[in-house]
Amino acid sequence: MRIKGLDGKEYNWNPSAVQAKAQSRSSLHLKAKELLDNLFPYDRILEEVSLVGSKTNRRKSILRADFFIPNRNLVVEVHGEQHYKFNNFFFKDKMSFYKAKARDSEKREWCELNDIQLIEFNYNEDIDEWRRKVE
């Protein structure tokens, strides 16, 4: 699959080959995985997929998507409270929080640039709201 990077270059992307090993997953992540498995029982659901071409001059690390469903050209992100509110558990300072918000924005930009649908599941929504976003 050809992908346009945030740097304007084109890349070959094989999402299956760029999955990270799932680390400890949050309860929200597990809940989202269960919902996606139920909604798309015959689709391959990839987790922690590297988004090629997402490095920038300001940020040298590559972005990752929580979930990617290739047959549906769909990225699903699970956003805990730390995506909306600063707290000392996740961030050492406010600058770290703002950098995380910038990464979320760059992920949206990457998906839009590549005509990939992005759905965000927010921590303060219930499972029915998540389901409605996907259906």
Where does each model-flagged region fall?
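Nucleic-acid endo/exonuclease domains
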Residues: 1-135
